[in-house]
Structures are given as C-alpha cells and as structure tokens.
Amino acid sequence: MDKIAVLIPCYNESKTVEKVVSDFRRVLPDATVYVYDNNSTDGTAELAAGAGAVVRHEYQQGKGNVMRRMFREIDAEAYILVDGDDTYPAEAAPEMVAAVTGRQADMVVGDRLSSTYYTQNKRPFHNFGNDLVRFCTNHLFGGKIKDIMTGYRAFSYQFVKTYPVLSRGFEIETEMTIHALQRNMQVENVVIDYRDRPEGSESKLNTYSDGFKVLGTIARLLKTYRP
C-alpha cells in the first residue's frame, strides 16, 4: 500500500503534464504519482513517464471511467486527485493530505471559489454554473461544500474504497460530493489559489452539455437518496 498516492487523470495534456508531475513529486516526496492516460494522442503518457510518473491507461473515454479504474487499482493511506492541466497549486497538497492523515477527514475539497477563481477563469458561464451547482447541492443535501466542481481533492482510503463510481464524465465531482454528504463523511474545505490554463491548453469541459449532465446527476441522486 502506498503512503500517499497522487492520481492525475489526463487526456491530451502534453503542455502541462510534466510540470504537474514534477511539482507534486517535489512537494510530496513520499508519494507515488500516477498518471492515468485516457486515449491521449499528443504524447501525454510518454511525457508523464519521463517526468517520473507511473503511467497507466483507461481506454473507455471519460473522467468518471478513469476514476473508477484509479480507485479500484490503487491502495493508499491517503490520496490526492488533481487535474493534469496545471491550474491547481501543488503547494496546497501537504495541507490537504494532513487533513486526511491527521484529522481523519474523508474528503478534502480544494476550494477555488473562495480565492482567485472568479478573476482567473475567463469563461463567465463556468462561474455561473459553479455557483448554481454549489447552491443546489448544498441546499438539497445539507452540505457546506465551498466548491463542488473542483478538480483538486484529497481522500481517505475509506472514501475511495466505498464510493461506487457511476458517472462516466465530468458529473463525477458532483456525484462524489453528494456521496460523502449522504454517508455523513467528514468533509473539509481548504482554500487554494487557482490559475487559468496556460496558452494553448484547452478545457475538455463543455459548459452547456456537461452543465446539463451535472444538473441531471443532482436530480438523479436526489431521487435515489431522498425518494
């Protein structure tokens, strides 16, 4: 079992993956860094391996599918999940891990919305969507989660091994937040700085289609947990 596992799902992140891997290896020297490549065509996997990551593959497209394989295959005392786009600061990882190992948190949310997200993010409808999803999730499920859609979290072993990954795409962030709330797991928020993607790096999230899927996930889980 790893002491700390850093899990990085990637699809065509050749411009940033080397830096992300190197940054997390630097701030968490006791961690094993895993990059799960999701059919990249730009050399992401090779670059990640060259930077020192353990590279594995998921051939079913979609972030949820990648996370299902990650959570099934990797055993660790604490986990960091982070996107490979270099928008999240590795420097916050030790504090997030400490919340899991020291305070027994099951999920630690890297909260962008209380920091630099609204000034750094150049997609205004993403801002509105984040606010809407946060309001709906907290209001309907009784949470105090500051950032539902963040791609930066820490988890306990208990969370990872009891969470049934159902969603295939970007709805996964909302789904796992609701799972933690419904299971009365300990959730903490850690404020992090956020920076927009570097020039030439493109988001895989579609504001409208993925946004409707997220709202549909909230409705589906509300029906499941609160029939």
Task: Report the location of each language-model feature.
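Acidic helix N-cap motif at the loop->helix transition within catalytic regions
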Residues: 15-19, 41-51
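Short aromatic/hydrophobic "clamp" motif used to bind/position activated sugar donors
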Residues: 79
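Short, well-formed alpha-helical segments that are part of the catalytic scaffolds
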Residues: 12-26
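Short beta-strand/loop segment that forms part of the nucleotide-sugar
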Residues: 7-8, 20-21, 30-39
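Cell-envelope/extracellular polymer assembly enzymes that use nucleotide-activated donors
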Residues: 3-5, 32, 175
